[in-house]
Amino acid sequence: MAGQKIRIRLKSYDHEVIDVSARKIVDTVTRAGATVVGPVPLPTEKNVYCVIRSPHKYKDSREHFEMRTHKRLIDIIDPTPKAVDSLMRLDLPADVNIEIKL
């Protein structure tokens, strides 16, 4: 697979879980003999939701909730067939969203 690049984007709400998953991917691929760039931390997406505390009145009393989406980017340059096979078998947590582009 000379001249190819695999780009992996990880998304999660928990920054500790995404860092552990990224470390697992990097360790697995480097053991298989491919070169890795990353994990590169991408900007954290922050969604803020404003909710009125009371169901009927007291509009001035509001509560804010936020949801942060942490993202990481990993590039695998010139992946070996062994590296691709080990990536397919890798077991990662369910709360990490993985996008793979060739």
Swiss-Prot record:
GO biological process: translation
SUPFAM superfamilies: Ribosomal protein S10
Molecular function, one GO term: tRNA binding
Domain of life: Bacteria
Keywords assigned: Ribonucleoprotein, Ribosomal protein
InterPro entries cross-referenced by the UniProt entry: Ribosomal_uS10, Ribosomal_uS10_CS, Ribosomal_uS10_dom, Ribosomal_uS10_dom_sf
An example Gene Ontology CC term for this record: ribonucleoprotein complex
Pfam families named in the record: Ribosomal_S10
Protein's job: Involved in the binding of tRNA to the ribosomes.
HAMAP family assigned: Ribosomal_uS10
Family per similarity comment: Belongs to the universal ribosomal protein uS10 family.
Oligomeric form and interacting partners: Part of the 30S ribosomal subunit.
Protein name: Small ribosomal subunit protein uS10
Species of origin: Micrococcus luteus (strain ATCC 4698 / DSM 20030 / JCM 1464 / CCM 169 / CCUG 5858 / IAM 1056 / NBRC 3333 / NCIMB 9278 / NCTC 2665 / VKM Ac-2230)
This protein's encoding gene: rpsJ
